């Protein structure tokens, strides 16, 4: 309802961005985040995009690219942020930093405020329907544990096993009609049909709907079922990453006869740190002191490196396969 006289209102283009904005991401442009969150919006809105790719993500090279390219806005994959945090990376001339792919915890957000002098915005989406949920610090401070609210133009819900919206844990779904939603899986009509239930695109991600946003629990395959608990790995990973000895980590469920699964952590330590049983116990206790008791990793293995995608995400599927293989070897 509009009431009264509607005057002519002159608006600045600054509403769409700042004149000095300049975009960059270390992510490959073949990834939906690099393509639809950086390259295409930059081209559409006339914002410069820096093309600079590293063979291996390094903090010093990141700082050089930002400086030489006069970058003001960066989209970082979560693993890139973890590497920067582990190196005590610091830069204060960025206007915005965004991240998508995995949830960020309270410690990472606090680090962003200290070392980047800003609040990191979280995005959520997938190739089939990109950036449907987001935090925006220009509107409100993010709430730890929530990945944000539906972006205008998208209707997002959480469905139970019967395809009915629920406030309990369920599958995150997006209603048809979103501009960023796929048309189809190319020449795969059956796979396309299975991606939808009625009018909803099913993401395959588990979540919970709250009044102030949506909680991401994990990929359906990533959720660990242990002694009746359903456990998302991200919270445990984020906790372990706050320990000064941990460089990166992947958490999965390992098959177990009595508990169905146990929480298993695969950890890469920082240079100079000793990977032994004592360190494993220290890290277990570290999690016990900070999270609910059922969340601590009952087993920890140390690796030289973790399997990663080209976009910097830990490939938990390969870690689960490794855990299954360990079980088979233990039975022999």
Segments the model singles out, each with a brief description of its role:
Residues 3-73:
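Conserved AMP-binding/adenylation subdomain of ANL enzymes
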Residues 321-332:
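Acidic/polar alpha-helix N-cap and adjacent early helical turns
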Residues 101, 125, 148, 205, ...:
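Active-site glycine-centered loops adjacent to acidic/histidine catalytic or metal-binding residues
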Residues 149-153, 164-194, 231:
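Conserved ATP/PPi-binding loop(s) of AMP-dependent carboxylate-activating enzymes
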Residues 74, 178, 183-184, 191, ...:
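AMP-binding/adenylate-forming catalytic core of the ANL superfamily
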Residues 19-20, 94, 169:
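Phosphate-coordination loops involved in phosphoryl transfer and adenosine-cofactor binding
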Residues 93, 117, 153, 245-248, ...:
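Glycine-centered tight turns that cap/initiate beta-strands
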Residues 44, 71-76, 84-142, 155, ...:
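Gly/Ser/Thr-rich phosphate-binding loop
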